[in-house]
Amino acid sequence: TEMIINIHYKSEIIKNYIRDKFPEKNIILSYEKKLLDTAGGVKNASKHISNDFALVLNSDVFWSKMNFKEILNSIQSLHKDTKCKLFLIESKNAYGIDKVNGDFSIKNGKLERYNYNFPKLYYSGAQIISLNFLKSYKKNIFSFNLIWDDLIKKNMLEGEIIKSKWYHVGDYKGLNIVKDLD
């Protein structure tokens, strides 16, 4: 298993922390001299990945063992034609997030951008991306939103709802919610 962490802001602090806390782990740090945005950063890091697919995780989420169990089960059933599969959270299982609108909805079995007529789903910060598909984008600085919108237009963006609780920790409110969890 390869673990790659994109770094830019405070990269020396992160590099030293990883080196000191996880010396026995094979963690590759992929430095972005210039910010490449979400998809561009993963595309840049993909040179370190030998697999066809990458599991991409955002760092502002507290990942529980149950979250990972659900994601790993989904990886086992992944089909080779998958371009991108998002892991989504229903609002009833989302903690530490105050968004009025969701990120996505499922309409007639298809994933689309949030539609207030359907239950709101949040992007969990986890996705599986085909690296060959990602590399087909000629840009080097670009967001996953571009990929998602392209795939939505083609009815090819996949999504799976994670049933376990999910904790967003991108601000102090979210951090305070999870500080006492095991």
Protein language model regions, located:
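Short, hinge-like loop/turn segments at secondary-structure boundaries
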Residues: 20-24, 46-48, 73-74, 101-107, ...
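Conserved beta-strand termini and adjacent loop/short-helix elements that scaffold enzyme active sites
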Residues: 8, 30-32, 87-89, 114, ...
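Structural beta-sheet core signal
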Residues: 5, 56, 84-87, 159
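Short, high-confidence coil segments that cap the C-terminus of an alpha-helix
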Residues: 51, 80-83
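Catalytic-core segments of class I nucleotidyltransferases/pyrophosphorylases
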Residues: 55-57, 62, 68-78, 92-96, ...
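Conserved N-terminal catalytic core of the sugar/cofactor nucleotidyltransferase
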Residues: 1-58, 136-139
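Short beta-strand-to-loop element that shapes/binds the nucleotide-sugar donor at the catalytic cleft/hinge
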Residues: 9, 85-103
